[in-house]
Swiss-Prot record:
Organism, as annotated: Thermus virus P23-45
InterPro entries linked to this entry: TerS_C, TerS_N
GO molecular function, one term: DNA binding
Keywords: DNA-binding, Viral genome packaging, Viral release from host cell
The protein, known as: Terminase, small subunit
Domain of life of the organism encoding this protein: Viruses
Lineage: Viruses, Duplodnaviria, Heunggongvirae, Uroviricota, Caudoviricetes
Subunit comment: Homononamer; forms a ring-like structure through which genomic DNA is translocated into the capsid. Heterodimer with the terminase large subunit; the active complex is probably heterooligomeric.
Function comment: The terminase small subunit binds to the packaging initiation site and regulates the ATPase activity of the terminase large subunit. The terminase lies at a unique vertex of the procapsid and is composed of two subunits, a small terminase subunit involved in viral DNA recognition (packaging sequence), and a large terminase subunit. Both terminase subunits heterooligomerize and are docked on the portal protein to form the packaging machine.
Similarity annotation: Belongs to the P23virus small terminase family.
Length: 171
């Protein structure tokens, strides 16, 4: 499988060669002289493609918003879960209405367990999403490939894990 001219230009550029060196190097392999203008054209196309991509800050903001939406959704589910427990306990006591006058709704234990599982799954998904985003941003967010997440980002992971533990359904 042959490597395209564009791919060769980009690989050499990423290795630190300047456009004139790339043109000279590729001219040695080619059956014709490669000009610096051709190399610059390929690099300009690559820059144009990259400029259309969202910035790391945009990606971080989107991840943060998605995690916040998941947290809010999870809190809503947790409130439903707690209401299910309240109704189940009242039902087990033989009550037909709560002290505040609201009617007792019949709830099955299987429904309560399914809701608890869903809440815990959201916890796992939130932590996994945050860790994956930190891993990706660590690879592309610095000049050193594979850089570790910043201390602030690690603190955010610890806060999320603590929040998940605090909000876990208790049966």
């Amino acid at each position: 499988m042959s490597v395209s001219f564009r791919d060769r230009v980009l690989k050499l550029y990423l290795l630190g060669f300047d456009p004139s060196e790339i043109a000279q190097t590729l001219s040695l392999d080619a059956k014709r002289k490669v000009t610096e203008e051709e190399v610059l054209h390929v690099l300009a196309e690559a820059r144009e493609l990259l400029s259309a991509l969202p910035s790391l800050e945009d990606i971080r903001a989107e991840v943060g918003q998605a995690l916040e939406r998941a947290r809010i959704f999870q809190k809503d589910l947790l409130a439903i879960y707690q209401n299910m427990l309240r109704n189940y306990n009242a039902m087990m006591e033989g009550l037909t209405e709560h002290p505040d006058g609201t009617p007792v709704i019949g709830v099955r234990p299987a429904d309560i367990a399914a809701m608890a599982d869903r809440i815990m799954k959201i916890d796992q998904e939130r932590i996994t999403a945050l860790l994956n985003s930190l891993k990706v941003l660590g690879h592309v967010g610095s000049t050193t490939a594979g850089a570790l997440p910043s201390a602030t980002e690690l603190v955010r992971v610890e806060e999320l894990v603590a929040e998940v533990v605090d909000e876990a359904p208790k049966t």
